[in-house]
């Protein structure tokens, strides 16, 4: 009995996911793995640059 419920929940979850994709809410999923990796690396580089600037500002103040 539990498996039937589990299947139904999985079906509903999958249906919701496909509806979101068709509505265009999940645009990030349309990226390939390499594109996503490139985008994420750029974001992390920007964050690291900001963190380094904050760190250097704190050391110059002391």
From Swiss-Prot:
Annotated Gene Ontology cellular components are:
cytosol; nucleus; protein-containing complex
Where in the body, by tissue, does this protein show up? Expressed in brain (at protein level). Highly expressed in the testis.
Q: Where is the composition biased (Basic and acidic residues)?
A: 1-30, 50-62
Q: Where in the cell is it found?
A: Cytoplasm, Cytosol; Nucleus
Question: Region (Disordered): which ranges?
Answer: 1-62
Instruction: Output the GO biological process annotations, alphabetical, semicolon-separated.
Output: amyloid fibril formation; protein destabilization
Q: Which UniProt keywords apply?
A: Cytoplasm, Nucleus
Q: From what superkingdom does this record's organism come? A: Eukaryota
Which Pfam family, an example, fits this chain?
SERF-like_N
Q: What InterPro entries is this protein classified in?
A: SERF-like_N, SERF1/2-like
Q: What is its main location?
A: cytoplasm
Q: What is this protein for, i.e. what is its function?
A: Positive regulator of amyloid protein aggregation and proteotoxicity. Induces conformational changes in amyloid proteins, such as APP, HTT, and SNCA, driving them into compact formations preceding the formation of aggregates.
The record's section on PANTHER family has: SMALL EDRK-RICH FACTOR 1
Q: Which family does it belong to?
A: Belongs to the SERF family.
The entry describes its oligomerization and partners as: Interacts with SNCA; this interaction promotes the aggregation of SNCA.
What is the protein name given in its UniProt record? Small EDRK-rich factor 1
Organism of derivation: Mus musculus
């Amino acid at each position: 009995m539990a498996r039937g419920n589990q299947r139904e929940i999985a079906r509903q979850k999958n249906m919701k996911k496909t509806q979101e994709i068709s509505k265009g809410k999940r645009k990030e999923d349309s990226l390939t793995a390499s594109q996503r990796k490139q985008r994420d690396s750029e974001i992390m580089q920007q964050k690291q640059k900001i963190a380094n600037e904050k760190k250097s500002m704190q050391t110059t103040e002391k």
